[in-house]
Regions:
Chain B
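Peripheral docking tails and interdomain loops at the edges
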Residues: 307-353
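Redox- and metal-dependent alpha/beta enzyme cores, enriched for Fe-S-associated oxidoreductases
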Residues: 14-36, 210-285
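A short, acidic, amphipathic alpha-helical segment used as a generic capping/interface helix at domain edges
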Residues: 60-63, 273-290, 307-308
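A charged, amphipathic alpha-helical module
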Residues: 2-9, 121, 125-243, 271
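Acidic/His-rich segments in extracytoplasmic proteins that coordinate ligands and/or metal ions
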Residues: 58-133
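Proline-aspartate-enriched helix->loop->beta-strand connector
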Residues: 71, 286-296
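An N-terminal, globular interaction/scaffold subdomain
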Residues: 18-91
Length: 416, 353
């Protein structure tokens, strides 16, 4: 917590705790709840009134309580790998830990585990959830990113048929319909398609507020907010996408940022270098983002979390299920598949007027070098760092702060 | 720089989902790029692919070195994370002119259902167009039917080879080399190689091999040198490969639907199949082939097989078949891992007696 912390970030964190307690209570009273992967079509569950917990968010809570290693050890004791896709696997390992080792009192056993078949392993992890007493698994296809027309962020809100291709959408749409039937059979509830359409509208509204906020920050000089503050302020409401609360929270964030700009708030008093952070958040050392304010006047003005919330989610269309398929059919392609990834980071770097980029290279995505290359081609210096964002041992040995200091001295001149 | 002459009669393939009949219908021969169990992976390939199975890195290195520049085109199957990443990387490099081979993704999800079948048929239709484009061939229903017959001749030869293998007249190393020929040389030549695959087998364990695919036969040689005989496997460089012809149908669309149906009923792969299906298939095949032991060898960063171990162990315990597993096998550790695994099996065998 810093004195500059956004009220919207603190409010989001408070809400999440209350929401989780309520979800636990509902499960204990016999309501079926779902565990879902981040890129599964959550909106269906919301429309059918089925509470859900996002696997990656839950992993972050377990990790924050330093229970990740214990959870992985538990997997190893069952003969499962503790070295493979750990972040997605941690909740599975945590589920059987004794009560005193369970984050926030533990996740009640879900009735449903829902994921898309991304990579080689996600489906295996979710299949194992389905072997647990009282849990069933539903898996959706994850097709390859082909085609990839340029400027995806202009196409995906409305021209998603062109952006992703009708074949990919046909398949996912059909599978979402299968998911709806599967859930109906098990809960006795039917999908109210008008309600789903309203949920899609609310998700789009939320994305529009995020877009306005992102645009405000892009144009603001000096920058009025810390990136490590916008991360929770954007991500917590993302898991509540399709609710009025999420829209209101996105709007509150926007209004707070606008007020700060009007009031001339600067998170770095003497802003001389504007930096972009490409890659996942450095959860193991969030204070790192403000470490270069005093000596270098260097401030991180961009992380992907707000930007993808602005560009990645909006999908408008008459058919809510097809629009929902369009939201998820290539969601991660937008961030991680070349050439889409490189084009988008360049667009964002130019819009935010950044002077340098720190690129935390993810080893689980292809062509990371294309991103650095494209930014350098625009005259923006890039520092590539290879480290695990969630593992403090890895980021420590990568000497991240020291290398950023060297980078600032050698390659990023101060603005006049 | 010498200009490479493109051979319109050869189309490369990465992965094991290709309906080879479509390539054959274009008058071309599919040539699978396998990579290798050992050898360095360049920093450039590692950087481009991120952290993936080293075999993919070795294939990418061979492409970047220009070793396949004379291919008419390259089809990359989305049958593993590593191969999909390779497609993404090569698509960019091809667009820049850094790789001169036209590249095509073949994305064929496994499993049943009308929606999946429609998607796979659409992919096959795109593949037909790609083959037409890179070979300048006319592909119609007649060409597809004739190619179906040719592919069936390869499939039949492989079936004869599997019978010899089951009868103890063809060792695993020979069988794997025959499969390799089937996947990478012209069909007539492949049939000759496959029919010639006949070698005496040892008296040791009848081994079933699962886990990562085997890009070459070095590990099989090591296993068989240690006294075992590899009698069957489920990876896609061996019994899990796909050689099937579809010669029926009144139209191109009929043939493609027929191929999609064949694809949907293939046995599950580690990277794309469910663990339960895989364990069930393993139990059935181990019983059918009279395997006396099972070995899993999984390379580092080819993680799917590691998630299957408890289910496979349980399935084999019901059959009382011993099981040895080595995972996270390093870039140069395949031979020692396979020796260790065989030794572990032999020790179990000794303790059983």
């Amino acid at each position: 917590m810093t004195e500059d912390r956004l009220a919207a970030a603190a409010a989001a964190t408070r809400h999440q705790k209350a929401w989780f307690a309520d979800t636990v209570r509902r499960a204990q009273e016999g309501e079926p709840i779902a565990l879902v992967n981040a890129d599964a079509p959550h909106e269906v569950l919301r429309a059918m009134g089925i509470p859900y917990v996002v696997n990656q968010w839950w992993a972050s809570i377990i990790s924050a309580k330093r229970l990740g290693p214990t959870s992985l050890e538990h997997l190893a004791e069952r003969g499962l790998p503790d070295f493979s896709q750990q972040y997605d696997a941690i909740p599975l390992g945590a589920q059987d830990l004794p009560a005193h080792q369970r984050a926030w009192g533990g996740l009640p056993d879900p009735a449903f585990a829902i994921a898309e078949r991304s990579g080689d392993v996600t489906q295996k992890i979710f299949e194992l959830w389905g072997e647990r007493e009282g849990t069933e698994t539903f898996l959706l296809s994850r097709t390859g990113a082909d085609p990839v027309p340029s400027s995806w962020w202009e196409k995906v809100p409305r021209d998603w048929e062109d952006a992703f291709g009708a074949d990919r959408l046909d398949l996912l749409q059909a599978e979402i319909e299968e998911l709806i039937a599967w859930l109906s059979e098990r809960t006795g509830r039917s999908l109210d398609r008008d309600r789903l359409a309203r949920i899609m509208d609310l998700g789009n509204e939320q994305a529009e507020w995020n877009r306005r906020t992102r645009d405000l920050i892009a144009a603001a000089r000096p920058t009025p907010v810390l990136v490590n503050d916008t991360m929770p302020a954007v991500m917590v409401p993302q898991w509540h996408r399709g609710t009025q609360w999420a829209v209101d929270t996105a709007r509150a964030l926007h209004d707070e940022v606008a007020r700060r700009i009007d009031d001339g708030v600067a998170v770095c008093a003497d802003e001389k270098r504007r930096l972009m952070w490409v890659g996942r958040g450095l959860w193991s050392d969030l204070d790192m983002y403000r470490r270069f304010h005093e000596e270098f006047g260097a401030v991180f003005v961009w992380s992907m979390y707000l930007a993808i919330a602005a560009d990645g989610y909006p999908r408008y269309g008459e058919d809510a299920v097809r629009a929902l398929a369009a939201r998820f059919v290539g969601f991660t392609d937008q961030l991680y598949v070349p050439p889409w990834s490189a084009e988008w980071y360049v667009k964002e770097a130019l819009a935010h007027g950044v002077d340098g980029v720190v690129h935390l290279v993810a080893d689980d995505t292809p062509g990371a070098g294309f991103i650095s290359e494209a930014l350098e081609a625009e005259g923006i210096p890039v520092l590539e760092i290879r480290a695990n964002n969630a593992d403090s041992r890895s980021s420590g040995s990568a000497r991240i702060p020291e290398r950023i200091e060297e980078f600032l001295r050698e390659r990023v001149p101060a603005r006049d | 720089m010498t200009e490479v002459v493109r051979d319109r009669r050869r189309i490369g393939v990465v992965g094991a989902d290709l309906p080879r009949q479509i390539v054959l219908a274009a008058g071309a021969s599919p040539e699978r790029l396998f990579g290798a169990w050992s050898g360095a992976v360049s920093p450039r390939a590692s950087e481009l692919l991120g952290a993936v199975d080293a075999v993919a890195g070795r294939i990418l290195d061979s492409i970047l070195a220009g070793e396949h520049d004379d291919l008419a085109g390259l089809v990359i199957c989305n049958d593993s994370q590593a191969n999909l990443r390779m497609f993404y990387v090569l698509r960019v490099l091809a667009a820049r002119g850094e790789v001169p081979i036209p590249v095509q993704l073949l994305d064929a999800p496994r499993g049943q259902g009308a929606a999946k079948q429609a998607f796979v048929v659409a992919q096959y239709t795109r593949l037909v167009d790609f083959c037409r484009r890179v070979t300048d061939a006319d592909i119609g229903v007649d060409e597809l039917r004739r190619a179906g017959d040719v592919e069936q001749s390869v499939s039949d030869a492989l079936e004869r080879m599997r019978e010899r293998r089951a009868q103890g007249r063809c060792a695993g190393t020979s069988a794997l080399n025959a499969y390799r020929a089937a996947a990478s040389v012209a069909p007539e030549a492949a049939v000759e190689v496959i029919d010639a695959a006949s070698t005496p087998v040892g008296q040791g364990d009848r081994l079933f091999v699962t886990g990562s695919g085997h890009p070459d036969s070095s590990v099989y040689q090591e296993l068989e040198r240690a006294g075992a005989t590899v009698v069957a496997e489920d990876h896609d460089a061996g019994d899990g490969g796909w050689f099937a012809g579809c010669s029926t149908g009144e139209s191109e669309a009929d043939v493609l639907v027929g191929l999609a149906s064949l694809h949907a009923s293939r046995p599950p792969s580690a990277a794309r199949g469910s663990t339960a299906e895989r364990a069930g298939t393993l139990r059935r095949r181990v019983a059918d082939t009279g395997s006396t032991a099972v070995i899993t060898l999984a390379r580092d960063l080819d993680d799917a097989p590691a998630w299957e171990l408890p289910a496979m162990r349980n399935a084999l315990a019901e059959l009382r078949v011993p099981f040895a597993a080595r995972v996270q096998i390093s870039a140069d550790g395949a031979l020692s891992a396979s020796r260790d695994a065989v030794t572990a099996l032999q020790e179990k065998d000794g303790s059983r007696r």
